[in-house]
Protein backbone atom coordinates (compact mmCIF):
# COMPACT_ATOMS: atom_id res chain seq x y z
CA UNK A 1 0.00 0.00 0.00
CA UNK A 2 1.46 3.33 -1.14
CA UNK A 3 2.02 5.62 1.85
CA UNK A 4 2.03 8.71 -0.38
CA UNK A 5 -1.53 7.86 -1.39
CA UNK A 6 -2.46 7.28 2.25
CA UNK A 7 -1.05 10.67 3.24
CA UNK A 8 -3.00 12.44 0.48
CA UNK A 9 -6.20 10.73 1.58
CA UNK A 10 -5.58 11.68 5.20
CA UNK A 11 -5.02 15.32 4.24
CA UNK A 12 -8.18 15.48 2.13
CA UNK A 13 -10.40 13.64 4.60
CA UNK A 14 -9.10 15.64 7.57
CA UNK A 15 -9.93 18.87 5.72
CA UNK A 16 -13.46 17.55 5.12
CA UNK A 17 -13.69 16.54 8.79
CA UNK A 18 -12.83 20.08 9.88
CA UNK A 19 -15.36 21.53 7.44
CA UNK A 20 -18.00 19.47 9.24
CA UNK A 21 -17.02 20.70 12.71
CA UNK A 22 -20.51 21.98 13.53
CA UNK A 23 -21.71 18.41 13.25
CA UNK A 24 -19.34 16.97 15.87
CA UNK A 25 -18.07 19.78 18.11
CA UNK A 26 -19.70 20.48 21.47
CA UNK A 27 -18.61 24.10 21.05
CA UNK A 28 -21.28 24.34 18.34
CA UNK A 29 -24.10 22.98 20.52
CA UNK A 30 -25.49 19.69 21.90
CA UNK A 31 -24.14 16.57 20.18
CA UNK A 32 -24.26 12.79 20.06
CA UNK A 33 -21.41 11.95 22.42
CA UNK A 34 -20.47 8.76 20.61
CA UNK A 35 -19.75 10.92 17.56
CA UNK A 36 -17.90 13.47 19.70
CA UNK A 37 -15.63 10.74 21.07
CA UNK A 38 -14.96 9.47 17.55
CA UNK A 39 -14.00 13.01 16.54
CA UNK A 40 -11.69 13.52 19.52
CA UNK A 41 -9.93 10.29 18.60
CA UNK A 42 -9.25 11.70 15.13
CA UNK A 43 -7.75 14.81 16.72
CA UNK A 44 -5.51 12.66 18.91
CA UNK A 45 -4.20 10.59 16.04
CA UNK A 46 -3.85 13.59 13.73
CA UNK A 47 -1.79 15.18 16.53
CA UNK A 48 -3.92 18.31 16.64
CA UNK A 49 -5.40 17.90 20.13
CA UNK A 50 -3.70 21.04 21.57
CA UNK A 51 -5.66 23.16 19.09
CA UNK A 52 -8.99 21.91 20.47
CA UNK A 53 -8.85 22.41 24.24
CA UNK A 54 -12.32 23.99 24.16
CA UNK A 55 -13.78 20.74 22.82
CA UNK A 56 -12.27 18.72 25.65
CA UNK A 57 -13.48 21.19 28.27
CA UNK A 58 -16.95 21.11 26.72
CA UNK A 59 -16.96 17.34 27.17
CA UNK A 60 -16.09 17.83 30.84
CA UNK A 61 -19.00 20.28 31.12
CA UNK A 62 -21.56 17.64 30.14
CA UNK A 63 -20.24 14.97 32.51
CA UNK A 64 -22.92 13.82 34.95
CA UNK A 65 -22.72 14.18 38.72
CA UNK A 66 -22.16 10.41 38.92
CA UNK A 67 -19.04 10.71 36.74
CA UNK A 68 -20.56 9.26 33.58
CA UNK A 69 -21.97 10.66 30.35
CA UNK A 70 -25.23 10.13 28.52
CA UNK A 71 -25.39 9.18 24.83
CA UNK A 72 -26.61 12.72 24.04
CA UNK A 73 -24.88 15.68 25.65
CA UNK A 74 -28.07 17.46 26.71
CA UNK A 75 -29.38 14.41 28.58
CA UNK A 76 -28.38 13.42 32.09
CA UNK A 77 -28.77 9.63 32.41
CA UNK A 78 -25.29 8.10 32.26
CA UNK A 79 -24.61 4.91 30.31
CA UNK A 80 -21.46 2.83 30.45
CA UNK A 81 -20.40 2.40 26.81
CA UNK A 82 -20.31 6.04 25.80
CA UNK A 83 -18.96 7.06 29.22
CA UNK A 84 -15.93 4.82 28.74
CA UNK A 85 -15.28 6.23 25.27
CA UNK A 86 -15.50 9.79 26.61
CA UNK A 87 -13.28 9.03 29.60
CA UNK A 88 -10.74 7.35 27.35
CA UNK A 89 -10.52 10.38 25.09
CA UNK A 90 -10.10 12.70 28.07
CA UNK A 91 -7.29 10.76 29.74
CA UNK A 92 -5.44 10.38 26.45
CA UNK A 93 -6.02 13.99 25.46
CA UNK A 94 -4.82 15.23 28.82
CA UNK A 95 -1.36 13.77 28.19
CA UNK A 96 -1.04 16.67 25.76
CA UNK A 97 -3.26 19.27 27.41
CA UNK A 98 -2.20 18.92 31.08
CA UNK A 99 -5.38 20.55 32.35
CA UNK A 100 -6.56 20.18 35.94
CA UNK A 101 -10.24 20.07 34.98
CA UNK A 102 -9.56 17.10 32.72
CA UNK A 103 -7.63 15.37 35.50
CA UNK A 104 -10.57 15.77 37.89
CA UNK A 105 -13.00 14.58 35.23
CA UNK A 106 -10.99 11.42 34.57
CA UNK A 107 -10.95 10.62 38.28
CA UNK A 108 -14.71 11.08 38.51
CA UNK A 109 -15.05 8.70 35.57
CA UNK A 110 -12.89 6.13 37.38
CA UNK A 111 -15.24 6.35 40.36
CA UNK A 112 -18.24 5.90 38.06
CA UNK A 113 -16.91 2.69 36.51
CA UNK A 114 -15.87 1.24 39.85
CA UNK A 115 -19.39 1.87 41.17
CA UNK A 116 -21.13 0.53 38.05
CA UNK A 117 -19.37 -2.84 37.76
CA UNK A 118 -21.55 -5.90 38.37
CA UNK A 119 -20.64 -8.64 40.84
CA UNK A 120 -19.53 -11.05 38.09
CA UNK A 121 -17.14 -8.51 36.56
CA UNK A 122 -19.27 -7.24 33.69
CA UNK A 123 -20.64 -3.78 32.99
CA UNK A 124 -24.08 -3.38 31.41
CA UNK A 125 -25.61 -0.89 29.01
CA UNK A 126 -29.08 -1.33 27.46
CA UNK A 127 -27.81 -0.12 24.09
CA UNK A 128 -24.97 -2.66 23.81
CA UNK A 129 -24.16 -6.32 24.38
CA UNK A 130 -22.66 -7.01 27.81
CA UNK A 131 -19.37 -8.24 26.34
CA UNK A 132 -18.95 -5.16 24.16
CA UNK A 133 -20.02 -2.90 27.02
CA UNK A 134 -17.52 -4.56 29.37
CA UNK A 135 -14.67 -4.12 26.91
CA UNK A 136 -14.95 -0.33 27.10
CA UNK A 137 -14.29 0.22 30.83
CA UNK A 138 -11.59 -2.46 30.59
CA UNK A 139 -10.00 -0.49 27.74
CA UNK A 140 -10.29 2.73 29.75
CA UNK A 141 -8.64 1.05 32.74
CA UNK A 142 -5.90 -0.31 30.45
CA UNK A 143 -4.94 3.27 29.63
CA UNK A 144 -5.43 4.44 33.22
CA UNK A 145 -2.81 1.88 34.24
CA UNK A 146 -0.53 2.47 31.25
CA UNK A 147 -0.40 6.20 32.04
CA UNK A 148 0.17 5.59 35.77
CA UNK A 149 -2.93 7.45 36.92
CA UNK A 150 -2.77 6.97 40.72
CA UNK A 151 -6.44 7.49 41.62
CA UNK A 152 -7.77 4.37 43.41
CA UNK A 153 -5.07 2.31 41.74
CA UNK A 154 -5.69 -0.89 43.69
CA UNK A 155 -9.45 -0.76 43.05
CA UNK A 156 -8.85 -0.11 39.36
CA UNK A 157 -6.54 -3.11 39.05
CA UNK A 158 -9.07 -5.40 40.71
CA UNK A 159 -11.97 -4.13 38.59
CA UNK A 160 -9.92 -4.34 35.41
CA UNK A 161 -8.89 -7.93 36.14
CA UNK A 162 -12.47 -9.01 36.89
CA UNK A 163 -13.72 -7.37 33.70
CA UNK A 164 -11.00 -8.87 31.54
CA UNK A 165 -11.57 -12.29 33.05
CA UNK A 166 -15.30 -12.00 32.32
CA UNK A 167 -14.39 -11.52 28.65
CA UNK A 168 -11.75 -14.24 28.51
CA UNK A 169 -14.05 -16.82 30.06
CA UNK A 170 -16.70 -16.25 27.40
CA UNK A 171 -14.64 -16.81 24.27
CA UNK A 172 -16.03 -19.59 22.08
CA UNK A 173 -13.94 -22.62 21.20
CA UNK A 174 -13.62 -21.35 17.60
CA UNK A 175 -11.91 -18.15 18.80
CA UNK A 176 -14.82 -15.75 18.38
CA UNK A 177 -17.23 -14.03 20.76
CA UNK A 178 -20.94 -13.91 20.02
CA UNK A 179 -24.13 -12.29 21.24
CA UNK A 180 -27.37 -13.45 19.65
CA UNK A 181 -29.17 -10.16 20.28
CA UNK A 182 -26.48 -7.64 19.33
CA UNK A 183 -23.69 -9.45 17.46
CA UNK A 184 -24.91 -12.75 16.01
CA UNK A 185 -22.12 -12.91 13.41
CA UNK A 186 -19.44 -12.34 16.05
CA UNK A 187 -17.35 -10.15 13.73
CA UNK A 188 -17.54 -6.72 15.34
CA UNK A 189 -17.53 -7.95 18.93
CA UNK A 190 -14.48 -10.18 18.36
CA UNK A 191 -12.59 -7.31 16.71
CA UNK A 192 -13.48 -5.03 19.62
CA UNK A 193 -12.58 -7.41 22.41
CA UNK A 194 -9.12 -8.44 21.28
CA UNK A 195 -7.96 -4.87 20.58
CA UNK A 196 -9.81 -2.90 23.26
CA UNK A 197 -9.85 -5.21 26.25
CA UNK A 198 -7.29 -7.99 26.05
CA UNK A 199 -4.13 -7.39 24.03
CA UNK A 200 -3.05 -4.40 26.15
CA UNK A 201 -2.17 -6.78 28.99
CA UNK A 202 0.70 -8.11 26.88
CA UNK A 203 2.16 -4.60 26.77
CA UNK A 204 1.39 -3.32 30.26
CA UNK A 205 2.07 -6.05 32.81
CA UNK A 206 1.19 -9.61 31.72
CA UNK A 207 -1.14 -10.06 34.69
CA UNK A 208 -3.67 -12.44 33.13
CA UNK A 209 -3.02 -15.98 32.02
CA UNK A 210 -4.31 -16.99 28.61
CA UNK A 211 -4.39 -13.53 27.02
CA UNK A 212 -1.85 -14.23 24.26
CA UNK A 213 -3.61 -17.45 23.27
CA UNK A 214 -7.02 -15.77 23.37
CA UNK A 215 -5.92 -12.87 21.16
CA UNK A 216 -4.21 -15.22 18.72
CA UNK A 217 -7.37 -17.33 18.40
CA UNK A 218 -9.48 -14.20 17.94
CA UNK A 219 -7.16 -12.88 15.23
CA UNK A 220 -7.26 -16.19 13.36
CA UNK A 221 -11.06 -16.09 13.48
CA UNK A 222 -10.99 -12.61 11.93
CA UNK A 223 -8.72 -13.95 9.18
CA UNK A 224 -11.26 -16.69 8.48
CA UNK A 225 -14.19 -14.28 8.44
CA UNK A 226 -12.72 -11.90 5.85
CA UNK A 227 -14.47 -12.10 2.48
CA UNK A 228 -12.53 -12.56 -0.74
CA UNK A 229 -13.02 -8.87 -1.61
CA UNK A 230 -11.36 -7.78 1.65
CA UNK A 231 -14.48 -6.79 3.58
CA UNK A 232 -16.11 -8.25 6.67
CA UNK A 233 -19.71 -8.90 7.67
CA UNK A 234 -21.39 -8.61 4.27
CA UNK A 235 -19.62 -5.42 3.17
CA UNK A 236 -20.24 -3.60 6.43
CA UNK A 237 -17.95 -0.56 6.32
CA UNK A 238 -17.95 -0.07 10.09
CA UNK A 239 -17.10 -3.68 10.86
CA UNK A 240 -14.46 -3.82 8.12
CA UNK A 241 -12.76 -0.80 9.63
CA UNK A 242 -13.01 -2.38 13.09
CA UNK A 243 -11.39 -5.61 11.93
CA UNK A 244 -8.65 -3.89 9.95
CA UNK A 245 -7.66 -1.67 12.87
CA UNK A 246 -7.93 -4.49 15.38
CA UNK A 247 -5.54 -6.66 13.42
CA UNK A 248 -3.03 -3.82 13.12
CA UNK A 249 -2.46 -3.57 16.87
CA UNK A 250 -3.05 -7.22 17.76
CA UNK A 251 -0.69 -8.65 15.14
CA UNK A 252 1.99 -6.09 15.97
CA UNK A 253 1.88 -7.00 19.66
CA UNK A 254 1.74 -10.73 18.92
CA UNK A 255 4.45 -10.49 16.26
CA UNK A 256 2.15 -12.29 13.82
CA UNK A 257 3.12 -11.44 10.23
CA UNK A 258 0.24 -13.46 8.76
CA UNK A 259 -2.03 -10.47 9.30
CA UNK A 260 -0.21 -8.23 6.82
CA UNK A 261 -2.05 -9.40 3.70
CA UNK A 262 -5.39 -9.45 5.52
CA UNK A 263 -4.91 -5.87 6.71
CA UNK A 264 -3.89 -4.62 3.26
CA UNK A 265 -6.88 -6.31 1.61
CA UNK A 266 -9.16 -4.71 4.17
CA UNK A 267 -7.65 -1.29 3.62
CA UNK A 268 -7.88 -1.59 -0.17
CA UNK A 269 -11.58 -2.38 0.18
CA UNK A 270 -12.15 0.55 2.57
CA UNK A 271 -10.47 3.00 0.20
CA UNK A 272 -12.21 1.59 -2.87
CA UNK A 273 -15.60 2.03 -1.20
CA UNK A 274 -15.27 5.55 0.15
CA UNK A 275 -17.44 8.34 -1.17
CA UNK A 276 -16.06 11.45 -2.81
CA UNK A 277 -15.81 12.77 0.75
CA UNK A 278 -16.08 10.45 3.71
CA UNK A 279 -17.74 7.06 4.09
CA UNK A 280 -21.21 5.65 4.56
CA UNK A 281 -22.26 2.58 6.54
CA UNK A 282 -22.30 0.41 3.41
CA UNK A 283 -20.93 0.97 -0.11
CA UNK A 284 -23.01 3.55 -1.97
CA UNK A 285 -24.71 4.91 1.13
CA UNK A 286 -24.65 8.59 2.07
CA UNK A 287 -21.60 9.84 3.98
CA UNK A 288 -21.99 10.14 7.73
CA UNK A 289 -19.59 11.75 10.17
CA UNK A 290 -19.10 8.81 12.51
CA UNK A 291 -18.04 6.51 9.71
CA UNK A 292 -15.84 9.24 8.28
CA UNK A 293 -14.09 9.52 11.65
CA UNK A 294 -13.59 5.75 11.61
CA UNK A 295 -12.15 5.93 8.11
CA UNK A 296 -9.70 8.66 9.06
CA UNK A 297 -8.73 6.73 12.18
CA UNK A 298 -8.06 3.64 10.08
CA UNK A 299 -5.81 5.56 7.68
CA UNK A 300 -3.91 7.23 10.52
CA UNK A 301 -3.41 3.91 12.28
CA UNK A 302 -2.24 2.24 9.07
CA UNK A 303 0.37 4.97 8.67
CA UNK A 304 1.64 4.15 12.18
CA UNK A 305 1.37 0.42 11.46
CA UNK A 306 3.82 0.87 8.59
CA UNK A 307 6.40 2.50 10.87
CA UNK A 308 9.70 0.72 11.42
CA UNK A 309 9.06 0.88 15.18
CA UNK A 310 6.25 -1.59 16.02
CA UNK A 311 5.43 0.44 19.13
CA UNK A 312 4.16 3.37 17.06
CA UNK A 313 0.83 1.77 16.22
CA UNK A 314 0.39 0.50 19.79
CA UNK A 315 0.70 4.11 21.00
CA UNK A 316 -2.45 4.96 19.03
CA UNK A 317 -4.42 2.75 21.41
CA UNK A 318 -2.83 4.47 24.42
CA UNK A 319 -1.23 1.29 25.73
CA UNK A 320 2.26 2.82 25.50
CA UNK A 321 2.70 6.42 26.75
Q: PLM features: what roles do these ranges have?
A:
Residues 1-2, 26-54, 71-104, 108, ...:
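An alpha-helical repeat/solenoid feature that recognizes helix-turn-helix modules
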Residues 63, 69, 87-90, 117, ...:
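Fold-core signature of tandem repeat domains
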Residues 62-64, 215:
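Acidic-glycine-rich active-site phosphate/pyrophosphate-binding loop
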Residues 10-17, 59-60, 113-114, 167, ...:
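Buried hydrophobic core positions in alpha-solenoid tandem helical repeats
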Residues 1-13, 304-321:
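Intrinsic N-terminal pre-sequences and regulatory tails
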Residues 268-270, 311:
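Compact disulfide-stabilized, cysteine-rich extracellular microdomains and processed peptide cores
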Amino acid sequence: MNLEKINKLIKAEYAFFLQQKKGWSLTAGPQDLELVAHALRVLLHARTTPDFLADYLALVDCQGKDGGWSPFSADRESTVWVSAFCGLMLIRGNRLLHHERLTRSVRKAIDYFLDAQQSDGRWVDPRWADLDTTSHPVSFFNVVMALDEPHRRHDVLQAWERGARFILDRQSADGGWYDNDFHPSGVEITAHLIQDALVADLVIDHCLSGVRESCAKGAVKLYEWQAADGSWDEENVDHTMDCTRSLMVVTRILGDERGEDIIVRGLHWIIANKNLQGWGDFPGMETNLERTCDGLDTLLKYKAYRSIDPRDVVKLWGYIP
